[in-house]
From Swiss-Prot:
Single GO MF annotation: nicotinate-nucleotide-dimethylbenzimidazole phosphoribosyltransferase activity
Annotated catalytic residues: E323 (proton acceptor)
Pathway: Nucleoside biosynthesis; alpha-ribazole biosynthesis; alpha-ribazole from 5,6-dimethylbenzimidazole: step 1/2
Top-level EC class: transferase
Alphabetical list of HAMAP family matching this protein: CobT
EC number(s) given by UniProt: 2.4.2.21
Protein name per its UniProtKB record: Nicotinate-nucleotide--dimethylbenzimidazole phosphoribosyltransferase
Recorded name of the encoding gene: cobT
Catalytic activities: 5,6-dimethylbenzimidazole + nicotinate beta-D-ribonucleotide = alpha-ribazole 5'-phosphate + nicotinate + H(+)
Homology family: Belongs to the CobT family.
InterPro entries, per database record: Nict_dMeBzImd_PRibTrfase, Nict_dMeBzImd_PRibTrfase_bact, Nict_dMeBzImd_PRibTrfase_N, Nict_dMeBzImd_PRibTrfase_sf
Lineage: Bacteria, Bacillati, Actinomycetota, Actinomycetes, Kitasatosporales
Function: Catalyzes the synthesis of alpha-ribazole-5'-phosphate from nicotinate mononucleotide (NAMN) and 5,6-dimethylbenzimidazole (DMB).
Length: 357
């Protein structure tokens, strides 16, 4: 029997400090630029202040990109434009600096950490720090079999928690969370459809490397078949992840929840992270207060998940590539919001703040 009790997260996760947020709002009202004139940057600064329990808000100085990687056997059905089992090649390209997330991370001077959970490649071909948390090689074909055994699901969830603890202990003050997977959006679509009670066609998108109509129909059919297997286990989130999630998505869910426990804010990237966040919300309803939706990728599953969590993405650029690239685009906005909240001068007490002519 599993010793992991997900119900504990309900008690362990607190909301960002509401009193501090009110103090941040009061400070904002005294600044020389009228409240509301900075749009969502005002909200971002106040959210970050509450997450840090600090007024004025501290600058984000140690952000990090964390990418969980895995291959999904469902890709053998032709649901992805990439060959099944090829996520390891993407990981190597990320590490060598040739993927969009690598370019953006260099531009923004943000380190990138890749965590192999279930790549279908020899772990000896990867750096030890990448492969150290691997649970298995590849994942089960979710339309006909479980993605993970119960033991593997617990190990993956605990690995995600451990990575969150490692980041918090190392001083990371904000995480951009993403995935590197082939077939991952099919698993994500299944989770979203199951948790939102909707049909497969509503959540089936084209993926990071767009697929044609025939592949879309195969993907929709795979999600439909996986949904039949997911619905009986909706009451047990760890079993749901074992049934149709996979090691990378299970680890991301554990990472998100433990980051909320450790009070480390997380920027969500695309549909895969949104699906994991939706599972996390089912586990602990306060957890999403620690997460920020970076962008609208145009993937219908992401839109459905964010709507269910009442999260509004910061950007709409149609970035579907995944791998944390869209999440990184939102990081400068968060950093700008923190700088504005902390550095704009305040007026003297009682002095009215007015718009410039």
């Amino acid at each position: 029997m599993s010793s992991l009790n997900l119900d504990d997260f309900t008690d362990l996760i607190e909301r960002p400090d509401g009193g501090v947020r009110r103090d941040a709002e009061a400070r904002r009202e005294r600044q020389v630029v009228p409240p509301g004139s900075l749009g969502r940057l005002d909200d971002l600064g106040e959210w970050l202040s509450a997450a840090q329990s600090a007024v004025p808000v501290r600058p984000v100085v140690r952000p990090r990109v964390v990418l969980f990687a895995g291959d999904h056997k469902v890709a053998e059905l032709g649901v992805s434009a990439r060959p099944a089992g090829s996520a390891g090649e993407l990981v190597r390209e990320v590490l060598e600096g040739g993927r969009p997330v690598s370019v953006l991370a260099r531009r923004l001077d943000v380190p990138v950490r890749v965590v192999d959970m279930a790549l279908d490649c020899d772990p000896e071909t990867l750096p030890a720090e990448v492969a150290g948390h691997r649970v298995r090689r590849g994942g089960g074909r979710i339309d006909i079999e479980d993605a993970l055994t119960p033991e593997e699901a617990e190990a993956a969830f605990r690995a995600g928690m451990a990575v969150a603890d490692e980041e918090a202990d190392s001083g990371t003050d904000l995480v951009v969370l993403g995935d590197v997977s082939v077939g991952g959006t099919t698993a994500a679509g299944t989770l979203v459809a199951a948790l939102c009670g909707t049909d497969a066609s509503v959540v089936t998108g084209r993926g990071g490397l767009p697929i044609d109509d025939l592949a879309w129909m195969r993907k929709c059919a795979a999600i439909r078949d996986a949904l039949r297997r997911a619905r009986p286990v909706l009451g047990d989130q760890l079993q749901l992840l074992a049934t149709v999630g996979g090691a990378d998505l299970t680890a991301m869910t554990g990472f998100l929840l433990q980051s909320a426990v450790r009070k480390v804010p997380v920027i969500l990237d695309g549909v895969v992270t949104a699906a994991c966040a939706l599972v996390g919300q089912r586990v602990a309803f306060r957890a999403p207060d620690w997460w920020l939706a970076a962008h609208d990728s145009g993937e219908p599953g992401q839109a459905k998940a964010l709507d269910r969590m009442a999260m509004e993405p910061l950007l709409t650029q149609g970035v579907k590539v995944g791998e944390g690239a869209g999440g990184l685009l939102a990081l400068p906005l968060v950093q700008a919001a923190a700088s504005l909240a902390a550095e704009l001068p305040t007026t003297a007490d009682g002095e009215a703040v007015t718009d410039g002519e």
